[in-house]
Design a protein with these regions (language model features):
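Short beta-strand/loop element within the Bergerat-fold HATPase_c
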Residues: 133, 166-178
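Short conserved segment of the HATPase_c
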Residues: 191-203
Length: 251
């Protein structure tokens, strides 16, 4: 029994590594399709859906197995690949985001707690702890629920990726200059000064991304572009070895 499970684990791990290689190769081909013809978006959507179907099957197989530390790690890896695929899909559809907007009143505190709960497996796996703070203010904003959830989720993943075990990620809702703001701060490795002006550039991974070897340079680009379409703003402050803070301003 032990030998059979080990074989299955090795197969699963091999699958994940293979799909990561496919993902890296696919990123390098996007610009070629984009420049050669107008059908590149169709190709991307089809490719992503095929990959997501394979990942769903693998996730179901893992969830049906006996719970273990190894299986938990594999599920986290599958979740990461799935999110990378969603980023590619959103990148392909970025020009049409404005058609998909539904602006409404959103309880920011409820959204944050919901997204934290959705990512609890990732928090547990990395031994990173979330903390939500509200500075005596309303937490209601006008925005698009789906896309705001996506943005907060991206910033959470970015913070966890560059945090150390036992670090905290702090969510602080506050008023600044009569504007509601959301700070998402970590106590992780921070960003070198030279990289900060470029972190929202497409495909830019910086020193941390190259060291981590798990960055595509897509997530923060999407965050900035979608926030602009929502009429919100974002800024970043960071100090190497002390952490990073992203602030979203809800105009």
């Amino acid at each position: 029994m032990k030998k059979r499970l080990q074989g299955t684990d090795l197969f699963t791990d091999s699958f994940i590594k293979h799909e990561n290689q496919n993902y890296d190769q696919f990123l390098s081909e996007i610009e070629n399709y984009k420049n050669k013809n107008s059908e590149w978006r169709t190709y991307i959507v089809q490719w992503v859906h095929q990959m997501k179907s394979s990942i769903s099957s693998m996730r179901l197989a893992l969830q049906n197995r006996k719970r273990s530390k190894e299986n938990m790690q594999l599920l986290v890896e599958l979740d990461q690949i799935d999110k990378q695929l969603n980023n590619i899909l959103n990148l392909a559809r970025l020009e049409a985001v404005y058609r998909d907007l539904k602006i409404e009143q959103i309880n920011l505190s409820e959204s944050i707690n919901r997204i934290i709960n959705q990512n609890k497996r990732l928090f547990i796996q990395n031994k990173v702890f979330p903390k939500v703070q509200i500075e005596n203010t309303t937490s209601t904003v006008l925005s698009d629920k789906k896309w705001l959830d996506f943005i907060i989720d991206q910033l959470i993943h970015n913070a966890i990726k560059f945090s150390n075990p036992t670090d905290q990620i702090i969510f602080n809702i506050k008023q600044t200059d009569n504007k509601l703001c959301l700070d998402i701060s970590d106590t992780g490795i921070g960003i070198i000064k030279e990289d900060i002006p470029r972190i929202f550039d497409l495909y830019f991974t910086g020193k941390n991304g190259r060291s981590n070897n798990n960055s595509s340079g897509i997530g923060l680009y999407l965050v900035k572009q979608i926030l602009e379409q929502l009429g919100h703003k974002i800024k970043v402050e960071s100090e190497q070895s002390k952490g990073t803070k992203f602030t979203i301003y809800f105009d």
